[in-house]
């Protein structure tokens, strides 16, 4: 490659990236996933689009996509709270294993019938599109206030289901490439255990070593993020090299670092946020360039049948069977999880495997995977907000600070500065600071008014437009945000958690005469907390609801996994 070609490469790459960034606001206006914008830019720049760029280097696409996916999973792991595993780990693992296998089987049979393929070839198509995509799920769920059980299950599933899909894809390619070779069940079982076992061990072990290394190192501030990124990629590559799941390993590395006091954690997350955006743009641009839309014309009708068959039948069946042991999931939860089986980059990456192996029909597999991804992003991704509202798994948006930044006083400091801007409808307007019930361990460090820094005292009264800088820790974030939150304008949001609240240590016997509750066959000392556990199980989450006798009960407050208060909606009001 000469200097002119290199400059042309830089020019085209930078131009496509800039166009993708500038077009990204269209995502919210059109109600479509932002990843689809990046993919569309790549397709338009490609062979059949106005750009006319001929790109058919599957090896380069595979390299770029795997690197990008590793970075996205590292960032996603660092932002996942281990506390969510309390309610979502086992359901997510069931979906990541049994769910993928069931989806693969049903989708594979449909593909074999629709495209007149051998049943093994059909299963290969099913395996390629069988897993949900972490990049798509993390991107579309980011910033959404979903029921914790549902949101965490979807995120953990997307971060851990790729090993199963990779295992099935690689195994089926090996069988199809050597049809005369018999592969024993024990061999396949050992391969499966190796993928998951090595992936988990190297992810957690490598995460611990990297965490120790980061905290013991004394580096320039900007180098910690590079150390984490390079360390994560080392573990990712080592896991793949040894036969484990690099995807699972790097997700667990991020999970370990994100849930431990890590030196420079906030700076690392800021850098990873930018790297994740670059990775998403680069990955979907390259995959878009790889597609020749005219090749999809011949598979249009059966392709739609396959995509909608997977969305409307295979995925729901897999979800309902996989979640059978978990009674805490309501029917609405299950339907929403079924609908958010988003496909993205991973199926396209897996579709490159047969191309690189030189399998007959590999181009068909690739085109089918791409078509399914396009339909999934357009149909499921674009309707995510509507689906969440219909399934009633979306909680009222949590009040959050305008910005937050770390205060790196100590190597593993967890102190942060939260910035709040007070509008006229904030609850605390007009109140002196001394009357604010500030959470323990927090302090208002500064108040800005009309671009002027005030020296706050107990008598300082807050005004609309004030900007507050509050020093505290993440554990106090919810209490602070509620204190400085805006009064909800939407009446439905106001009523989501009920007409009034009661604490869970209240005895039902005390409520019975007020609300006409019948307590036959119930213990005299039964509390509201006991009722919640009997109705929702041991691990309820914020927003969980149930109807009991004439009242509608909603979990309205949690502390360290325990329900602290419950909202009650009166029977005279219409129930959700």
UniProtKB/Swiss-Prot annotation:
Catalytic activity, reaction form: K(+)(in) + H(+)(out) = K(+)(out) + H(+)(in)
Q: Where is the RCK C-terminal domain?
A: 405-486
* InterPro entries assigned to the protein according to its UniProt record, in alphabetical order: Cation/H_exchanger_TM, FAD-bd_PCMH-like_sf, Na+/solute_symporter_sf, NhaP2, RCK_C, RCK_C_sf, Transptr-assoc_dom
- Assigned GO CC terms: plasma membrane
SUPFAM superfamilies, A to Z: FAD-binding/transporter-associated domain-like (SSF56176), TrkA C-terminal domain-like (SSF116726)
Localization, UniProt: Cell inner membrane
GO process annotations (BP): cell volume homeostasis
Question: Is the keyword Membrane assigned to this protein?
Answer: yes
Which cysteine pairs make disulfide bonds? none
Any one GO MF term held by the record is: flavin adenine dinucleotide binding
Q: Which residues cross the membrane?
A: 6-26, 34-54, 58-78, 87-107, 109-129, 163-183, 185-205, 219-239, 242-262, 271-291, 299-319, 335-355, 359-379
Could you tell me the superkingdom of the organism this chain comes from?
A: Bacteria
Topology in membrane: Multi-pass membrane protein
UniProt entry keywords in alphabetical sequence: Antiport, Cell inner membrane, Cell membrane, Ion transport, Membrane, Potassium, Potassium transport, Transmembrane, Transmembrane helix, Transport
Name the job this protein performs: K(+)/H(+) antiporter that extrudes potassium in exchange for external protons and maintains the internal concentration of potassium under toxic levels.
Family named by the database record: Belongs to the monovalent cation:proton antiporter 1 (CPA1) transporter (TC 2.A.36) family. NhaP2 subfamily.
What is the designated name of this protein? K(+)/H(+) antiporter NhaP2
Organism of provenance: Shewanella baltica (strain OS155 / ATCC BAA-1091)
* Originating gene: nhaP2
């Amino acid at each position: 490659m000469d200097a002119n070609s290199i400059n042309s490469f830089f020019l085209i790459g930078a131009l496509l990236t800039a166009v993708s960034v500038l077009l990204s606001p269209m995502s919210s206006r059109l109600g479509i996933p932002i990843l689809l914008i990046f993919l569309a830019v790549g397709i338009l720049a490609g062979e059949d689009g106005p750009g006319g760029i001929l790109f058919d280097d599957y090896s380069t696409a595979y390299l770029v996509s795997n690197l990008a996916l590793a970075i996205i999973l590292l960032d996603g792991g660092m932002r996942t709270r281990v506390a969510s595993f309390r309610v979502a780990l086992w359901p997510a693992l069931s979906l990541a294993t049994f769910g993928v296998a069931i989806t693969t089987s049903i989708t594979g049979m449909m593909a074999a019938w629709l495209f007149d393929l051998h049943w093994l070839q059909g299963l290969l198509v099913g395996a390629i599109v069988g897993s949900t995509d972490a990049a798509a799920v993390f991107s579309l769920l980011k910033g959404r206030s979903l029921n914790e059980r549902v949101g965490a299950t979807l995120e953990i599933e997307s971060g851990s289901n790729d090993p199963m899909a990779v295992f099935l894809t690689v195994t089926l390619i090996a069988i199809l490439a050597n049809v005369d070779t018999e592969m024993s069940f024990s061999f396949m079982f050992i391969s499966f255990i190796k993928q998951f076992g090595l992936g988990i061990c190297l992810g957690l072990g490598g995460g611990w070593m990297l965490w120790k290394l980061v905290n013991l190192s004394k580096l320039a501030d900007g180098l910690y993020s590079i150390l984490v990124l390079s360390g994560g990629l080392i573990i990712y590559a080592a896991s793949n090299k040894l036969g484990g799941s690099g995807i699972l390993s790097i997700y667990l590395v991020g999970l370990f670092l994100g849930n431990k006091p890590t030196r420079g954690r906030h700076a690392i997350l800021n850098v990873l946020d930018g790297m994740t955006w670059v990775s998403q743009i680069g990955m979907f641009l390259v995959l878009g360039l790889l597609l020749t839309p005219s090749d999809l014309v011949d598979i249009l009708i059966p392709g739609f049948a396959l995509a909608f068959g997977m969305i409307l039948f295979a995925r729901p069946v897999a979800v309902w069977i996989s979640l059978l042991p978990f009674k805490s999931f309501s029917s609405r939860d299950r339907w929403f999880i079924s609908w958010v089986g988003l496909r993205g980059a991973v199926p396209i990456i897996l579709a490159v495997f047969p191309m690189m192996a030189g399998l007959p029909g590999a181009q068909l597999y690739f085109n089918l995977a791409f078509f399914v991804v396009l339909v999934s992003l357009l149909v499921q991704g674009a309707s995510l907000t509507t689906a969440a509202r219909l399934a009633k798994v979306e909680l009222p948006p949590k009040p959050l600070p305008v910005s937050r930044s770390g205060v790196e006083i100590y190597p593993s400091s967890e102190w942060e500065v939260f910035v709040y801007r007070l509008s006229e409808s904030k609850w605390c307007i007009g109140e002196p600071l001394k009357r604010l019930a500030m959470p323990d361990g927090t302090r208002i460090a500064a108040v800005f008014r009309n671009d002027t820094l005030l020296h706050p005292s107990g008598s300082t009264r807050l005004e609309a437009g004030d900007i507050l800088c509050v020093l505290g820790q993440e554990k106090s974030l919810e209490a602070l945000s509620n204190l400085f939150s805006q009064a909800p304008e939407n009446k439905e949001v106001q009523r989501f958690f009920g007409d009034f609240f009661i604490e869970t240590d209240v005895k039902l016997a005390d409520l019975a005469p007020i609300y006409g509750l019948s307590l036959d066959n119930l213990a005299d000392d039964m509390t509201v907390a006991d009722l919640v556990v009997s109705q929702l199980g041991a691990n309820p989450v914020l927003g969980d609801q149930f109807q009991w006798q004439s009242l509608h009960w909603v979990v309205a407050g949690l502390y360290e996994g325990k329900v602290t208060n419950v909202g009650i909606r009166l029977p005279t009001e219409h129930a959700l």
